[in-house]
Structures are given as C-alpha cells and as structure tokens.
From Swiss-Prot:
Its main location: mitochondrion. One of its GO terms (biological process) is mitochondrial translational elongation. One of its GO terms (cellular component) is mitochondrion. It comes from Aspergillus terreus (strain NIH 2624 / FGSC A1156). This is Elongation factor G, mitochondrial. Keywords: Elongation factor, GTP-binding, Mitochondrion, Nucleotide-binding, Protein biosynthesis, Transit peptide. Mitochondrial GTPase that catalyzes the GTP-dependent ribosomal translocation step during translation elongation. During this step, the ribosome changes from the pre-translocational (PRE) to the post-translocational (POST) state as the newly formed A-site-bound peptidyl-tRNA and P-site-bound deacylated tRNA move to the P and E sites, respectively. Catalyzes the coordinated movement of the two tRNA molecules, the mRNA and conformational changes in the ribosome.
Length: 802
C-alpha cells in the first residue's frame, strides 16, 4: 500500500507532529482506523497563543484540504485498505455533522402494500404537506407522490417520485434533533421494475413494506433481490395491521424463511384488525398510541396493556437472541446472561442493519394513521448516513481499477445521473452526488463521452414541484435542467477519470407493432418515442426493415399500454397497435463443422474469403461465444475482427424464425485469403453465410420466454385458478393456502399468458390478481416451433414475390 506522504501536508500542520501522539485506535465503535490516515489526524498541531483567529482558521482549512487529498489518494491507490471508519474519522467536523443528519431512502414493496399511502403520511407528519390525500384520487387531488393523472386513476405508481423532508427526532433527554430525508417512492408492479432498480442504485437505505395479511409476496422477493444487488440495508414495516386476518408474526417468519435475512420485531401490536390501537416499543418497553384527527401526535406510556405483556416479553427475548446470532457484542452479553441496555440494543441493531445482517421490523397502519412516526425514528436510528456507505467507482486512467468514493465536499466532483424526465422546462436529470460539490453555473464533464456541460439550474424535487438551490454537497440527491445525457451517465469536474457502473437493466420480453393513426402525427410520434426511450431503459423502439413496422418492446402488456396511453394524453397521438409479439430466441442444436468459401471475381476487385471451423452449443444458454484458434497466420488479425463482427451480426437475426440467437459458440481454426480480393467486408459476409448454413444443419430449436407467475385469489377459488393455469400448460411449483386467500406459484410460457387477466377475473369474480416476471428461456413445444417456422417461411416467400 502506498501511504499518503506527510510531506504533502502544510509545513505548519507538521510543526507539532513530534509532540502530538498518533492515535491508531479509533474512538468510533465501528472498527480500527486504517494506518494510512491515522497519522493524518495527529498532525493537528496546537497553534501558538499569539496566532490570530484568522490565521488559525486558514491553517485549519489548509490542514483539512491536505487531509482530504491524502484520503483521496488512499481511496484510489489502496481502496481495500482504506476503511469507511477512516473516511468518517477524517471528515471535516462541520461536514461530519451535516452528513450524520442526512438519510437517502426509498420505499419499496409488492403491489398494493401501501407504499404511496405510507409516503403520504411521512410527508404529512414531517410537515411537507398540509393535508392527507388518498391514492386513487377520489377526492380529485390524489396522493402527492402520484403526480401523473394515470397514476391517480389506476391507483398504482408508474414512475418513482423523489421528495425531501425534515424529521425532528427527540433523544432520551427530550432534546430535538432535525434530520434531512431524501425519499423516493417506487412502483410495486413488476412491469416498472426499472424504476425500483435505479432508485436502489443511488440510495443508502430502504424501507421494505409488507402487508400484514399477505406477508412476503412475489414482488417482495424481487425487491429483496434488487436490494441485495446494490447492498442496500433495509428496515421492514408491516403495514395494514387494521385489516382482517392481519398476522405480523407470520410475515416476520416469512422474511426469515423466504427472504433468508434474519429479522425480528422491535415492536409488537396492541390489538389487531379492527381493534388495532398502537404498538409496544420493545427496546424501551413503552406503549405508543397515535392521537389527534390524523394521528399527528404520539402518546407514550409505561403502562403496557395486560393482554400484550407476555407477547412483548417473548418477542423482546427473541429480538435479543436474533441479535446475538449476528452481533458479537450482544452475543457476549447473551452468553454471560447479562441483560443488554436499551442503547446497546439500539447500537447492535444499527451495526447489524448497516452490515446487511439483519432487518428490524416495525408495524402499523398507514391508512389508519397509526405507528408511522416510530418507523421514521427507525429510519434515523438504524439506516446509514451517506458517509457510512461504501461506494465504488472505476478509474478509466488505471484500466478501470476500483476506487473508493469519499463523501467530502472539498474533493473533485463525482455524481451519477440515475433518472431522466421530460418537464415543461426541458429534460430534468436526477443526480446523486457521491463526492465533491455540484454548483449552479459550474462546468461538468460526462465520463461516457467527455463532453463538457454547464449546469444552468439545480433543484430539489417534491414530486412534480421543485425548489431551486445554488449547490448540492456530497451525499445529496438533486435534479438539474439543461443537461443532455443518458440514464446511468457519470459526471465529474474533469479532474478525475472516474466512471460508475450503471444499474442492471433487464431485457424486454414483449413487443408490439405500432404506428400513428394519422400520418400528420408522425413528427409528434417520433418525438414521444425518443423521449420515452431516454427516460426508460427497458422501453425499446426498433424498426423492422422487412415488415416496415415500428416495434416497441417492454416488460409486459401493462408497461406498453401505459406508454400508448401517455402518447395519447401527452402528445395527442392516437396509435394503432398489432397483436403482442413474444421475444422468441433461436439456439443451435448439435456440434457441426463448416468450411465455407466466398468467391466473387469478375475482372475488377473481387471478394475472396474462406473460413473453416465448427459451431456448437455454449455452456450457458444466455451467451454467445466467438473464438479463433488460427495457427500460422492463415487469416490475419484484422480479418478475424471482421469475422467476429459477422458472427455477432448473424446472432442478431437467426435464420430459423428471424429472432435473436442464444447459446451458440463459433470457433474458426483455419481459412484462406487472396492477395488482392480479400477484405474485411469479404470475411464478415463469409462468416455470416457460414453461420447461417451451419446453424440450419445443426437441428436448431426455438426458445420461448418462461415467466415466473404468482396468482393470488380467495381460497374458495383455488381449484379454478389451478385449472386455469393447467389449461395454459403451466408448471405449478408451489402454493400457499392462507386463512382467506391462496397463492399459487407457477412457471408459464409468455405466449400462453396473453389474455390471462380477463380469464382470471372471470374465474374469481374479479377478486384474483397475478404478477409475471421473466425467469428463463426454454425450448418451445414442437407444435409451436412448426407454426413459427412455417409462418416465418411464408412471410419470407411473400416478401420475395413483391
């Protein structure tokens, strides 16, 4: 490891180094500081009494700047050795105080678990809005975070919405502390999963909401996978405690068993269903009730109702036992049979939550205005501030080596554009600042194309409203106008060559042909398509040259329907759509060898290329592989690049039914060139021809997308639901029968699920619901393969007749 040189520090900062002791052990409870920055802290020499206050301030600024620079160097040269604790310890005290009061959180859950309702209460209790409005917009207003008319009509969240609020939390002495919360409310429907992906990519923590009746559902498991992908700590909130059949402890068991993350209640409910009154805080052993017209006031008492005393004691013991499994300090106390104090429990929950080892579980009812404020206290107590989260970037100047980002305002800027929106003032770009300061009027550089951009306006977003600010520091989220970029772009101030890995973007599974009904709307149609693609990476637009149709692709029928409806409302463009098209794939069958010669010589410059090798299935179905094993230079390197390009072009449109190719390997081990007639174009074309011929000789197959499907319906319709799935050749994997509802888990082909929603509603008297998520590709049935091949061959023949 290259240690930061003390020679880089100002001379005055070094003057007292010999006298000042070097602290190797951090006072912070987290862990030992790294050696590279321990010496930096010790260099703060005591200024002579004669120095002026102004001179002391200047010296402190110089020292802070040198310390930040040394930490930045350690973050780049030895990121593994620079601990997050060392970064925190060397923070400027003012910055440390600011960051300790910031929380960047998201709210995520299954459909209809109450995310937006809960967010509405958070905004009301923090004073961000003056009145509570409900989700479906029945009062002609609708929830604040559902700003689109479509969201209010359908009662679902389509786009993630960002806001900020201040929460005042009281400590044990009753002293008030103000915390700043950047909050993103996300959709629950699987079709809008990219909105959850990009929110979690930039957040430091999350609140996972579960229904007290349904517990862990299909989209809960998807959200859990997304949180794990981005290492996002979470607290859990069991909502709808006032619903019939509410059972929070069953939900906690499901978090432990289905999500496989240790979880324990930090509250127990006082009553349930219609008798739900409040909660008991298991750390302080106090009963908490909401009072006031909208539950805006809390009443705490030491008198725990007799009916819940035994449950509270039992669940407190379970909390301590669970913590003992994930935290060393509590484990020692547990083994010595010592009762941990409230503060020890609080610290242990925070350590384990930030360490992704545990999730504390809160409970309440957002709709009934009960127990939302204690959950907000949990956000402050147990979720990390920006300085406690490790964020990495890639240094393009050092072969994309990993570097640690340091949340100091004084360091060079690094920020990530994670979401784009079109507004009345132009493109709105949401940015998370990880390092440095983003200032109005500053020039920043897009790391993707090194393009310089000026920042004309910076705003904080409150759903569809905005508040202008002059600058944003490290650890904050904002939006900027007038920046032309793509979702996932990294911005720097030009001093660093850093880029951040972008979010995971799933492949579309369904397509539709689309065109405007009126040709006069073609310009507006093109403008809408371009905008929607910029905003949503899972929405794709392609033009099929053979059929001369524009195709839109997305994550499901609802996803595409929403964009068609938005085009009508926002651009006044009515569209005609064709039937849904499944994103089939083609794959090779057997190992097959090829020896293909392309030879066209007609007096002038001709074409000559010979490629020899074999094709076979890959080990992983999800990838295509091109390899070369040329010995003796029979094909030069520049022609081999052309061969590889030809291979990838051939994979874009397979010869069987015209869809993309998967799971195919091509290896070229010999060939021949001509002194004058060989060219890159010749070898590219020869490779494509060899590919098509060998592929068709290999007994290829058509693959169809299989969807992980979860159907929920009242228990009396279990037989009807299973019969409906069997009719569509679904593979039923599991079922959960609850008190009043049944959940069936199955794998179904996407092709067989078109129109399923209307059949499900008819079979369950409108009470059934289902979600689908892409699972994997599987060989289509022989009958379907024959139909698809015949249809493609007929279309090709008809096209050649024209």
């Amino acid at each position: 490891m290259r240690y930061p040189s003390l020679a880089r520090l100002p001379r005055r900062a070094l003057s007292g180094l010999a006298r000042a002791p070097v602290r190797l052990q951090s006072q912070n409870f987290l862990s030992q500081r790294c050696a590279s920055t321990a010496a930096l802290r010790s260099a703060s020499a005591v200024a002579p009494a004669c120095q002026s206050a102004l001179h002391r301030q200047f010296q402190q600024r110089r020292y802070a700047s040198a310390t930040a620079s040394a930490v930045l160097e350690a973050a780049a040269s030895s990121p593994d050795n620079l601990t997050q604790e060392a970064i925190i310890d060397n923070l400027d005290p003012v910055e440390a105080e600011r960051l300790s009061r910031v929380r960047n959180i998201g709210i995520a859950a299954h459909i209809d678990s109450g995310k937006t309702t809960c967010t509405e209460r958070v905004l009301f209790y923090t004073g961000r809005i003056k009145a509570i409005h409900e989700v479906r917009g029945g009062d002609k207003v609708g929830a604040k975070m559902d700003s689109m008319d479509l969201e209010r009509e359908k009662g679902i969240t389509i786009q993630s919405a960002a806001t900020f609020c201040d929460w005042v939390k009281k400590d044990k002495e009753g002293k008030e502390h103000k915390y700043h919360i950047n909050l993103i409310d996300t959709p629950g429907h699987i079709d809008f999963t990219i909105e959850v992906e990009r929110a979690l990519r930039v957040l430091d923590g999350a609140v996972m909401i579960l229904c007290a009746v349904s517990g862990v559902q299909s989209q809960t498991m998807t959200v859990d996978r997304q949180m794990r992908r981005y290492n996002v700590p979470r607290i859990s909130f069991i909502n709808k405690m006032d619903r019939m059949g509410a059972n929070p402890f069953k939900a906690i068991d499901q978090i432990n068993t289905k999500l496989k993350i240790p979880a324990a209640a930090v509250q127990v409910p006082i009553g349930a269903e219609d008798e739900f009154e409040g909660v008991v805080d298991l750390l302080r052993m106090k009963a908490i009730y909401n009072v006031g017209p909208s539950g805006e006031e809390l009443r705490e008492t030491d008198e725990i109702p007799e009916k819940v005393k035994a449950v509270a004691e039992e669940r407190r013991n379970m909390l301590i036992e669970t913590l003992a499994d994930v935290d060393d300090e509590i484990a020692e106390l547990f083994l010595s049979e010592t009762e941990p104090t409230e503060q020890q429990l609080r610290d242990a929950i925070r350590r384990a939550t930030i360490g992704l080892k545990f999730t504390p579980v809160f409970m309440g009812s957002a709709l009934a205005n009960k127990s939302v404020q204690p959950m907000l206290d949990g956000v402050i107590d147990y979720l990390p501030n920006p300085s406690e989260v490790q964020n990495l970037a890639l240094d393009k100047k050092r072969d994309e080596a990993s570097v640690k980002l340091v949340p100091y305002n004084s360091l060079p800027l690094v920020g990530l554009a994670f979401k784009l929106e079109e507004s009345n003032f132009g493109q709105l770009t949401y940015i998370r600042v990880y390092q440095g300061t983003l200032r109005k009027g500053a020039n920043v550089f897009n790391a993707r194309n090194d393009k310089k951009v000026k920042i004309p306006r910076i705003v904080r977003m409150h759903s569809n409203e905005m508040e202008e600010v002059s600058e944003i520091g490290a650890g904050e989220i904002c939006a900027v106008f007038g920046v032309d970029c793509a979702s996932g772009d990294t911005f720097t101030d030009g001093q660093l060559g850093y880029t951040m890995s972008s979010m995971f973007v799933p492949e579309p599974v369904i397509s539709l042909s689309i065109k405007p009904k009126n040709n006069k709307d073609a310009a507006k149609f093109s403008k809408a398509m371009a905008r929607f693609q910029r905003e949503d990476p899972t929405f794709r637009v392609t033009f099929d040259a053979e059929s001369e149709q524009t195709l839109i692709s997305g994550m499901g029928e609802l996803h595409l329907d929403i964009y068609i409806e938005r085009m009508r409302r926002e651009y006044n463009v009515d569209c005609e759509t064709g039937p849904p098209q499944v994103a089939y794939r083609e794959t090779i069958g057997n190992h097959v060898e090829f020896d293909h010669l392309l030879k066209k010589q007609s007096g002038g410059p001709g074409d000559y290329a010979r490629v020899v090798g074999y094709m076979e299935p890959t080990e992983k179905l999800e990838e295509n592989v091109f390899e070369e094993q040329i010995v003796g230079g029979s094909i030069s390197e520049k022609f081999l690049f052309a061969c590889e390009k030809g291979f990838h072009l051939a994979c874009e449109k397979g010869p069987l039914i015209g869809h993309k190719v998967l799971g195919t390997k091509m290896l070229i081990n010999d060939g021949a060139t001509h002194m004058t007639d060989s060219s890159e174009m010749s070898f590219k074309n020869a490779t494509q021809q060899a590919f098509r011929k060998a592929f068709m000789e290999s007994n290829p197959s058509v693959l169809e997308p299989m969807m992980k499907t979860v159907v929920t319906a009242p228990a009396e319709f279990q037989g009807d639901v299973i019969a409906l799935l069997n009719k569509r050749n679904a593979t039923i994997n599991d079922s959960d029968v609850g008190v009043d509802e049944v959940t069936v888990y199955a794998d179904c082909s996407l092709n067989g699920m078109f129109g399923f929603s209307s059949h499900l509603r008819a079979a369950t008297q409108g009470k059934g619901e289902y979600t689908m998520e892409f699972s994997h590709y599987e060989k289509a049935t022989p009958q379907l393969q024959k139909e698809l091949i015949a249809k493609y061959q007929k279309a090709q023949a008809d096209r050649h007749k024209k």
